[in-house]
């Protein structure tokens, strides 16, 4: 089971080590709010591709307010000069949600080499620049261990190196206990749009076992 299911979704829950990316309570409005959250994430990811966004946590403490926490490798791109970009984003979200109270918090990801989303985006951007997929994967693996990663698994799927037949290449180093629920495993995917077609990138990073003071919210 642990080999097939999404490593992040497998560990989401109040007694497990991962938290939900959307936090709200709604009875009849659930579908509307869920679609709004998807549109907000799409807007942020499309507007700030260079910022390398890792996670977007959306909280709705009341019916009139929304709090958006954005984790990114380059937060300055999202903030913009004198806060111009974040003001544009805030106005766009206010228009989209019809809420008067929109709060946006930007957090910098310092250990970005053990953040699966950022690692996957980095590999994808290198593939788009025609860097060898083997070199991109090996560089990511080495950088991950330097920042404290205990295991990493990377896969690239598609017409690798311009080959006529699509295939999947894997690299794995260190431990990757996918069946262990207390194992803190980060997982993410990315897509590289190349002249040969789309190449899919998947990254799993094992950061160690969960302890009470290491709870990830």
Curated annotation (Swiss-Prot):
UniProt GO BP: translation
Q: Which GO terms describe its molecular function?
A: mRNA binding; rRNA binding; structural constituent of ribosome
The record's listing under Pfam families reads:
KH_2 (PF07650), Ribosomal_S3_C (PF00189)
Query: What GO terms fall under cellular component here?
Result: cytosolic small ribosomal subunit
Indicate the segments forming the KH type-2 domain, all copies: 40-110
InterPro entries named among the record's database cross-references: KH_dom, KH_dom-like_a/b, KH_dom_type_2, KH_sf_prok-type, Ribosomal_S3_C_sf, Ribosomal_uS3_bac-typ, Ribosomal_uS3_C, Ribosomal_uS3_CS
Record's keyword terms, sorted: Ribonucleoprotein, Ribosomal protein, RNA-binding, rRNA-binding
Q: Which SUPFAM superfamilies match?
A: Prokaryotic type KH domain (KH-domain type II), Ribosomal protein S3 C-terminal domain
| Family statement drawn from the similarity comment of this UniProt entry | Belongs to the universal ribosomal protein uS3 family.
* Subunit (UniProt): Part of the 30S ribosomal subunit. Forms a tight complex with proteins S10 and S14.
Summary of the function given for this chain in its UniProt record: Binds the lower part of the 30S subunit head. Binds mRNA in the 70S ribosome, positioning it for translation.
- What protein name is recorded for this chain? Small ribosomal subunit protein uS3
């Amino acid at each position: 089971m642990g080999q097939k299911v999404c490593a992040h979704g497998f560990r989401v829950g109040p007694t497990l080590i991962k938290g939900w990316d959307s936090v709200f309570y709604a009875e009849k409005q659930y579908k509307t709010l869920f679609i709004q959250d998807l549109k907000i994430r799409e807007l942020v990811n499309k507007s700030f591709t260079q910022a390398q966004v890792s996670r977007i946590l959306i909280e709705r403490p009341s019916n009139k307010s929304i709090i958006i926490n954005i984790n990114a490798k380059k937060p300055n791109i999202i903030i913009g000069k004198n806060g111009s970009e974040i003001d544009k984003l805030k106005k766009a979200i206010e228009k989209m949600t019809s809420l008067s109270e929109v709060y946006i918090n930007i957090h910098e990801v310092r250990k970005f080499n053990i953040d699966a989303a950022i690692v996957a985006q980095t590999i994808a951007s290198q593939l788009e620049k025609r860097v060898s997929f083997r070199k991109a994967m090996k560089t990511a693996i080495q950088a991950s261990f330097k920042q404290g990663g205990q295991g990493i698994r990377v896969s690239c799927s598609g017409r690798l190196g311009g080959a006529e037949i699509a295939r999947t290449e894997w690299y794995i180093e260190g431990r990757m206990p996918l069946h262990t629920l207390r194992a803190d495993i980060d997982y993410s995917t990315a897509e590289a749009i190349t002249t040969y077609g789309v190449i899919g990138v998947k990254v799993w990073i094992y950061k160690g076992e969960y302890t009470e003071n290491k709870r990830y919210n």
